[in-house]
């Protein structure tokens, strides 16, 4: 029998030669991009790697990390802008990337109809969500201006976004030469440039948004308590999504504090030195890049090896093994006391939350296998809708849109960029559309929006459409009530543009269904719910932003208020604690024991909700306890304030527990009416008070004085009656206006400048009737005026005029007080009008005084030609007559009548 093995071997050789020949013919090396190398720009799914063009039909991917997706492909387009990537992009390879990659390397072949001259961008693309996980730019493409930017652009030549080419490949800020695993959730990356004298360090951790990542060098030759006198850099992501990296120096294991000009604790270098030329030189850490993606915080910064700051920074020998320290913990945001992000004690277990090791920067280390995978990958803001508060929909620039690529303009709800919107079944949701007439808002089942029929896809529209568009001056209202058949996941978008909105989560009924009333507290950052049943009240409060604790208080301000604080311990157990606060320091926060039932505290993606039920009037055996005075009267407006912070405890409170954000003013909650108003808004009753005071001090009382000064020439006692009527009417209106203000404010405090001037003016005005009743008698005809009468006349005039002057000043201080409460934009016009009125009054008085002096001169001239029996001559004089006294009604009776003289013939 013949042996067939030689023939089989020959066939295999021919087949291999044929495959090699065919491949060689298809994969030529004519493209100018051959050999082009670039690093992937990370946008989502922790994508990292190096891209290299091999030949005309393939490319190599090395050191490739990526979290898995649903239907991920290699994608191509001419540029990285939204329209090109979304509408003109296409699949360039048969390979699918649906699994997780861990430091992988492989060759990718292009489809037969794809050539390099058709590509400017190669992307890792998820088809169902039109998501760009990351991409590289080829030499004929530039980065789109609308691409996601998580930090200011780097000035480094080694890490520079933008155009890439063969001679200067793109260096991604997320790529490093070395990586060390510090814990399961924390990694250290670095790239050394010893020639230029610096090291680039990247800190990466699956940690909370308000947490810090710290790394630095321990004090040389230190063997114990390595944190003390260490030179560290504290990094993290701010609340607005942008990174920070600051030099810190540790003098004590405590939060930074400055007392009597001396800084102690974990403080920035700049705190130890004044912020001058010296202060600016001590912070030599340079932030290069930072982002927060998929629940992973990443910050890259540059540190010089030999720092000019020898006081707080240690020199680093790149070839020597030195002790370094690291930590993870909660960050304390800036507040009214300090302007820095300060780390709080990390706590936890060594090697998980903190640790130390020996590091030689020159050693090559690669301990990081695959990307970090966070349990909670979504940090987007959450808006929880209810039936009583409309959701304001506007359009604004894209800063942190969660699903790149995206258009340059996206939707905002209640001033938050593309938040996740949570609605409850059975609860109507009201939208106020103010995004412009080119943005038609709608709720759809399609992930991308923008009218799915244009992409040959079907969608179900649940609310809105082409007609739901509006502007600020003329908003369009849309009411949508999800029902039990509404799917759990929907999307809000513009019908004319894809990917402007984000997700709508539909859940079963919650707080809005459980409580009869709800209002937004100051700045719309906390929602307050309540239901009154019998002699008890059930209360709930929900924050609208992520925080470590949520506090609400009953009172005008935190001082002298009763506080309810919802927080979580280290085990994740929620608590609601009660306190009486009688000062501004931590020692002024006193725990109380209130009779609360149905207490709950929960957190959903960092949004805290607290609930409890308490009696309206506490039943106390010891009435001297503070909580016994914490009574709620449903018929009286309840003043409610709020605060949020990073960390709370039921133990000894310190400055680290201070709130990071708080209400600016209390809100008056009308418990029986189910409504609320800002405590400092101009109330109608106070508006009436202001008008009445202007009528009295600006018109009636000055008019009474002018009548006594310039109407003496009227025959009879007409001027006196006008004077009396105006003064009495003005004084009556002053008292009515005062009663209105006292009743509305439940009394008044003399701490206000307005109250001081107003009360002084009222006292002076009240002295005038008493002064008039005590006036001395007029001297007889021909007699000299007495000293008592003269003193009375002067005092009556001076007190009256002083009262009007002080009253006008009180009007202006009232306007200033109104501006402090409501903002200057509401008061500037009123101040201008009041000033104009005072100016016109001054001009009028000047004119009347000029006329009076002219009339007086004419009268004096006519007296030399006095005709006997001329009854038409008016001999009335000024307020002060020739005898130095004031003329009153008695003078008019005596001098205003006809004089009879009997003439007898001379003999």
Swiss-Prot record:
Supply one GO CC term from the record. Answer: trans-Golgi network
**Pfam families from the xrefs?**
At5g54830, Cytochrom_B561, DM13, DOMON
Residue spans crossing the bilayer: 685-705, 730-750, 754-774, 795-815, 829-849
Q: How does it sit in the membrane?
A: Multi-pass membrane protein
Q: Boundaries of each DOMON domain copy?
A: 184-329, 524-645
Task: Report the cofactors.
Answer: heme b
Q: Does the keyword Signal apply?
A: yes
Cell inner membrane as a keyword of this entry, yes or no, is no
Residues annotated as binding heme b 1:
689, 754
PANTHER family, alphabetically?
A: OS09G0557700 PROTEIN
Query: Which protein are we looking at?
Result: Cytochrome b561, DM13 and DOMON domain-containing protein At5g54830
The lineage, from the top, is: Eukaryota, Viridiplantae, Streptophyta, Embryophyta, Tracheophyta
């Amino acid at each position: 029998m013949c042996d067939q093995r030689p023939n089989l071997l020959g066939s295999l050789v021919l087949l291999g030669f044929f495959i090699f020949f065919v491949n060689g013919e298809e994969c030529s090396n004519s493209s100018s991009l051959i050999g082009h190398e670039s690093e992937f720009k990370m946008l989502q799914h922790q994508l990292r790697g190096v891209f290299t063009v091999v030949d005309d039909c393939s490319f190599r991917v090395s050191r490739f990390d990526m979290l898995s997706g649903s239907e991920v492909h290699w994608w191509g387009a001419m540029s990285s802008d939204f329209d090109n990537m979304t509408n003109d992009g296409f699949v360039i390879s048969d390979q699918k990337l649906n699994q997780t990659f861990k430091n992988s390397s492989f060759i990718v072949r292009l489809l037969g109809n794809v050539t390099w001259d058709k590509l400017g961008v190669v992307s890792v693309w998820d088809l169902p969500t039109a998501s760009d996980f990351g991409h590289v730019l080829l030499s004929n493409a530039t980065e789109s201006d609308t691409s996601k930017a998580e930090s200011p652009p780097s000035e480094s030549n080694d890490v520079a976004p933008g155009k890439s080419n063969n001679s200067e490949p793109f260096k991604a800020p997320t790529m490093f030469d070395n990586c060390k695993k510090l814990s399961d959730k924390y990694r250290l990356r670095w790239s050394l440039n010893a020639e230029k004298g610096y090291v680039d360090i990247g800190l990466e951790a699956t940690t909370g948004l308000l947490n810090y990542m710290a790394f630095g060098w321990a004090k040389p030759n230190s063997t114990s308590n390595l944190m003390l006198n260490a030179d560290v850099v504290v990094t993290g992501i701010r609340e607005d999504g942008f990174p920070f990296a600051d030099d810190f120096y540790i003098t004590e294991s405590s939060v930074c504090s400055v007392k009597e000009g001396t800084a102690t604790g974990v403080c920035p270098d700049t705190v130890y030195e004044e912020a001058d030329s010296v202060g600016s030189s001590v912070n030599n850490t340079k932030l290069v890049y930072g982002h927060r993606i998929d629940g992973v915080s990443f910050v890259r910064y540059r540190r010089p090896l030999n720092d000019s700051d020898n006081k707080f920074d240690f020199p680093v020998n790149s070839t020597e093994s030195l002790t370094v320290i690291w930590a993870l913990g909660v960050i304390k945001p800036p507040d009214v006391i300090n302007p820095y992000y300060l780390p709080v004690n990390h706590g936890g277990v060594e090697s998980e939350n903190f640790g130390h090791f020996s590091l030689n920067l020159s050693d090559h280390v690669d301990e990081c296998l695959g990307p970090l995978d966070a349990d909670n990958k979504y940090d987007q803001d959450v808006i929880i809708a209810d039936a009583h508060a409309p959701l304001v929909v506007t359009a604004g620039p894209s800063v942190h849109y969660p699903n790149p690529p995206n258009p340059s303009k996206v939707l905002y709800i209640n001033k938050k960029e593309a938040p996740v919107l949570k609605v409850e079944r059975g609860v109507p949701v009201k939208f106020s559309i103010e995004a412009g007439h080119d943005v038609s808002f709608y709720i759809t089942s399609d992930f991308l929006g923008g009218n799915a029929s244009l992409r040959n896809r079907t969608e179900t529209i649940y609310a809105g459409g082409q007609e739901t568009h509006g502007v600020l001056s003329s908003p369009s209202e849309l009411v949508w009530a999800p029902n039990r058949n509404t799917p759990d996941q929907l999307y809000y978008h513009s019908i004319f543009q894809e990917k402007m909105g984000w997700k709508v989560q539909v859940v079963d009924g919650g707080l809005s269904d459980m409580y009869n009333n709800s209002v937004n507290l100051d700045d719309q950052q906390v929602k307050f719910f309540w239901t009154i049943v019998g002699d008890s009240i059930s209360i709930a409060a929900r924050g609208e932003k992520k925080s470590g604790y949520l506090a609400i208080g009953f009172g005008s301000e935190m001082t002298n208020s009763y506080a309810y604080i919802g927080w979580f311990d280290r085990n994740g157990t929620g608590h609601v604690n009660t306190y009486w606060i009688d000062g501004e320091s931590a020692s002024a926060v006193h725990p109380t024991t209130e009779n609360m039932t149905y207490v709950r505290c929960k957190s959903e993606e960092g949004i805290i909700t607290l609930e409890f039920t308490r009696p309206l009037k506490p039943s106390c055996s010891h009435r001297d306890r503070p909580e016994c005075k914490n009574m709620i009267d449903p018929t009286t407006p309840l003043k409610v304030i709020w605060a949020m912070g990073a960390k709370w405890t039921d133990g000894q409170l310190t400055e680290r527990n201070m709130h990071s954000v708080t209400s600016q003013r209390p809100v008056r909650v009308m418990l029986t009416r189910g409504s609320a108003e800002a405590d400092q808004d101009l109330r109608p009753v106070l508006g009436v008070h202001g008008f009445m005071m202007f009528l009295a001090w600006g018109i009636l009382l000055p008019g009474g004085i002018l009548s006594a000064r310039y109407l003496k020439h009227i025959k009879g006692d007409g001027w006196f009656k006008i004077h009396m009527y105006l003064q009495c009417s003005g004084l009556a209106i002053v008292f009515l206006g005062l009663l209105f203000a006292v009743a509305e404010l439940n009394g008044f405090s003399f701490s206000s400048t307005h109250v001081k001037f107003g009360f002084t003016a009222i006292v002076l005005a009240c002295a005038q009737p008493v002064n008039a009743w005590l006036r001395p008698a007029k001297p007889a005809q021909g007699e000299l005026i007495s000293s008592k009468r003269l003193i009375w006349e002067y005092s009556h005039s001076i007190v009256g005029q002083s009262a009007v002057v002080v009253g006008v000043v009180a009007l202006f201080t009232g306007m200033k007080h109104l501006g402090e409460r409501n903002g200057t934009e509401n008061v500037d016009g009123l101040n201008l009008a009041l000033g104009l009125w005072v100016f016109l009054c001054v001009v009028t008085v000047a004119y009347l005084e000029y006329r009076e002096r002219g009339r007086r001169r004419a009268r004096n001239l006519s007296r030399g030609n006095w005709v006997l029996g001329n009854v038409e001559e008016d001999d009335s004089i000024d307020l002060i007559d020739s005898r130095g006294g004031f003329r009153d009604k008695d003078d008019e009776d005596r001098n205003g009548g006809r004089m009879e003289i009997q003439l007898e013939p001379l003999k």
